[in-house]
Amino acid sequence: MDKIYAIIPVNQFANAKTRLSPFLTPEERRDLLKAMLKDITDTLKPIVDKVVIISRDEEVLAYAEELELTTIVEEEYKKSKAVNSSDDNPLNKALKQAMKWSRKKTRKVIILPSDIPLIGKTNVKLLIDQAKNFDFIIVPSKGGGTNTLIIKPLAIDMKFEGFSFNKHIEEAKRKKLVPIVHDSFYMALDVNTTEDLGEIMLHGNGTETKKYLESLGIKVESSHDHERLKVTRD
């Protein structure tokens, strides 16, 4: 059994990307997340054995089924009483649930967020090839978080939230795993701000995400202000 499953946790569409408000309306943010999710899963489908979406949102699960993805309904979150438990975070609990579901079906999992539409087949193939020889591969996000993990199911406790990159490295070392770090501009780019939208406009040729942003009349130009890119819309 030398399979690899992709696991993507997705929050509610209705609450997506609030940091992009008021630049994008709630409906536009919902459609943006749908476009990003399609880009990511279209990239993954030919490369992994199964793409799994875990969510508690019926709209997310229905959309995932439209995309012909495997879905898992997230268990109702109940805050753990244990101090510093990874289960205090609903995202970590959802990922643990998905890995429990996966562990007898696949040798490894690749865990990704739903907002990194520029990951690209080349990057993903490279990581999966590396995973044949290494049991812990991690891709940092630009803000100290974690944008991709490849591990055996339940190999470590999930430490998402805040500066999770260093937390996951520490957890790997605690479990005697050798961390392999893959730095990639495209995989580090998670979309949270208007400047991130500008990066998609510059680098997202051929993606559903860029096509959607273009349909909104979004434009980008160089800026000499405190932000590197000036992002506007018609």
UniProtKB/Swiss-Prot annotation:
<dbReference type="InterPro" id="IPR029044">
    <property type="entry name" value="Nucleotide-diphossugar_trans"/>
</dbReference>
<dbReference type="GO" id="GO:0052645">
    <property type="term" value="P:F420-0 metabolic process"/>
</dbReference>
<keyword id="KW-0548">Nucleotidyltransferase</keyword>
<keyword id="KW-0808">Transferase</keyword>
<comment type="function">
    <text>Guanylyltransferase that catalyzes the activation of (2S)-2-phospholactate (2-PL) as (2S)-lactyl-2-diphospho-5'-guanosine, via the condensation of 2-PL with GTP. It is involved in the biosynthesis of coenzyme F420, a hydride carrier cofactor.</text>
</comment>
<dbReference type="GO" id="GO:0043814">
    <property type="term" value="F:phospholactate guanylyltransferase activity"/>
</dbReference>
<comment type="pathway">
    <text>Cofactor biosynthesis; coenzyme F420 biosynthesis.</text>
</comment>
<keyword id="KW-0342">GTP-binding</keyword>
<dbReference type="GO" id="GO:0005525">
    <property type="term" value="F:GTP binding"/>
</dbReference>
<dbReference type="InterPro" id="IPR002835">
    <property type="entry name" value="CofC"/>
</dbReference>
<protein>
    <recommendedName>
        <fullName>2-phospho-L-lactate guanylyltransferase</fullName>
        <ecNumber>2.7.7.68</ecNumber>
    </recommendedName>
</protein>
<keyword id="KW-0547">Nucleotide-binding</keyword>
<dbReference type="Pfam" id="PF01983">
    <property type="entry name" value="CofC"/>
</dbReference>
<comment type="similarity">
    <text>Belongs to the CofC family.</text>
</comment>
<comment type="subunit">
    <text>Homodimer.</text>
</comment>
